[in-house]
From Swiss-Prot:
Heme b binds at H265. Bifunctional enzyme with both catalase and broad-spectrum peroxidase activity. Binds 1 heme b (iron(II)-protoporphyrin IX) group per dimer. This is Catalase-peroxidase. GO terms for cellular component: cytosol. Pfam families: peroxidase. Its EC number is 1.11.1.21. Its cofactor is heme b. Homodimer or homotetramer. It comes from the Bacteria. Belongs to the peroxidase family. Peroxidase/catalase subfamily. The record marks R93 as: Transition state stabilizer.
Amino acid sequence: MDPKTSAGQCPVMHGANTTAAQSNTAWWPNALNLDILHQHDTKTNPLGEGYRYREAVKQLDVAALKADLTALMTRSQPWWPADWGHYGGLMIRMAWHAAGSYRVADGRGGAGTGNQRFAPLNSWPDNANLDKARRLLWPIKKKYGAKISWADLIVLAGNVAYESMGLKTYGFAFGREDIWHPEKDIYWGSEKAWLAPTGGEGSRYSGQRDLENPLAAVMMGLIYVNPEGVDGQPDPLKTAQDVRVTFARMAMDDEETVALTAGGHTVGKSHGNGSAANLGPAPEGADVHEQGLGWNNHSSRGIGRDTVTSGIEGAWTTHPTQWDNGYFKLLLGYDWELKKSPAGAWQWEPVGIKEDDKPVDVEDPSIRLNPIMTDADMAMKMDPAYRRISERFAADQAYFSEVFARAWFKLTHRDLGPKSRYIGPEIPAEDLLWQDPVPVGPTAYDVGAVKSRIATSGLSVGELVATAWDSARTWRGSDYRGGANGARIRLAPQKDWAGNEPERLARVLAVLEPIAAAAGASVADVIVLAGNVGVELAAKAAGFDVTVPFAPGRGDATQAQTDVESFEVLEPVADGFRNWQQRSFAVQPEEMLLDRAQLMGLSAPEMTVLVGGLRVLGANHGGSKHGVFTDRVGALTNDFFVTLTDMAHAWVPTGRNSYEIRERASGVVKYTATRADLVFGSNSVLRAYAEVYAQDDSREKFVRDFVAAWVKVMNADRYELQG
């Protein structure tokens, strides 16, 4: 050590280099966070660039894995004993809470990435002690290694848990790929504290309890609703409304909601036999010697019957390790009264219950204890619509089991995408409407002849490109929905979306559909081919001969295969790529552009080159001239970037989201723009990309890069091409 270094000085890295010190966004909170476009790359993946999970998992011995999981369920470990000798309830809660973070509005969250291993989810109050479930799974994950992802294993463990307790599940599909660091793009809410009540700083509620979009949980740190009641105040009818909203935001109807609520609480128990004050920090805040485990109780026994998790204490059913419909028989068969758990949480307990209807203690079968219900459970009895469904399930266990099995499959597979992404021997044969089915399309047609007919159809470059873009831009990598495959742009609701310019769209489709029919091609393929033709014509006008890669085989979905309500969440309210937004929003246009780029799986350079190209192709919504910094509209030039970076121009605000570019010398207005244009000159990172494309030696590079990014967008939903 340098003798000049005092004992109080650090001779190596300072904390600012290794810990979460003040970041650029902390110093400049309004700066655009481009980090959301640069996640989950090969630098963070320890499995290497050549590893392909979707190929590796096909080598998995599924029967052996399921046998090991089944054995795990009843192999209680002394460091975290199984309730009644069965880990089923714990494993189901782990899988449920992984899948339950999904929200349909933006497709983010869910079980598809194994994100429950990382902050913030690994330390949410609602996920307390699920770290123990994952540690119990570790020997199995260790054994099967890279052939099974954590994401798949977590969900499969829940499935096997149900099967081990007597439920015939609907099926299972592999294919979920792990991420290796926390997601940076998911907005979980603005609250500054866990479980912050309504009305506090950053509250997610406004008006008459209107939940902020796209959120699908009532509090920061919860998966769905507060089990004690709205803001911790029991009132089953009020809680019923919270339940209905949160489950709807996961695309569940009332029957699925009742089935999932009851099915999740048919097995296992809630834990609150002690004081939460004795619990240590959550995993992310625990000391190094805790080795990633949180909520450890070093003040009392803290395991088995003395476990504290939610604070509510007790099982819901008489036989918590057995699949049946006893949940409804207790819920509907008894009156219930409010009580406090040993941990001080509100819970409902039955009045005058028969001794035989009580579940036994998790450690001593000679002891029987009251079952409990949460406020959400009581909503299944008190809400009239939920009550009717509950009564039917109580009367028909087979029907309840079937509805639950299907709803559980939907819950755990919704963010896996369409059926073409499913892998494994237990894929259900039935096509389900929520899977957005698309038939296989034809491939044996003359692509060249179709392109020739499109090129001579009289449609402009802008019309060709905009129509293809609108068809493909709905794809989102969060839950693999949307995209050009299926040509749903010609069906309700997409054909009537304002962002798709219905009149222009109908005119273009009237030209393209006969071309498809005559050639024996799908309309979906021809729409993409039309965009490709537009790009090729534009490149030629700029002096470059290019052939845009194309793979036939897209199918045409029918209206019957399209759930109109489900697709409404894919409607764009803004598209910075086409310089359009439906109205003014609290969020700036450039932030909405960035969010769409992230959902589309684009990098910052790809976003940059696509915006610059689409501007000069005349693809703006409604023929807007904003950002069209060229005198050669329809030619794929780098004029957008050349103009943007030219200091001969000055930019002058003319409204909230409108600007003029003026010649500095004369003051003459040359062009107009929006924030979605100017951000490429104002943001230091985006300007660096813009300068590359503005260079004199980058004209061809710009064209090549635009084509590559364009093809990526057009093929985003061609999963059969991706392996």
